Amino acid sequence: MRAPKFWYEPNSWKATFLLPLGYLYNLLTYLRGKTGKPLKYNCLTICVGNLNVGGTGKTPTTIALADHFLKKGLNVHIVSRGYKGKFQGTFLVNPRNHKADEVGDEPLLMSEFTSVWVSKRRKNGIAAAEKAGAQVVLL
């Protein structure tokens, strides 16, 4: 998926129209960072991605990072929200027992490479991964 052309045309009407939304997003992100309670974990935590959704390479990048850390001998776990999955709560994906409509297609794919936790709340997923011995958690 390519970035929209208007991203590179600062004087286009689309860019001008979206500019106030960009300022609002920036303000809300700043305020969230200032008012939120920082969470501390005992493992390296790396978040892959940003506002872009679908087709930007987040899953292949996550798999490549997992492979990199696995080759260094580290215990790597991935935490995913399980987009479009039916299951609730926090659980470890088992590629032999779960189906894509239950856990989401990307967690199921990534579970072929390393341990993957599905949790709508990231902090619960990270806590479960740490309890299971994760040294590196990829979000």
Where are these regions (language model features)?
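A transmembrane-helix-recognition feature enriched in membrane-embedded lipid enzymes
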Residues: R2-T45
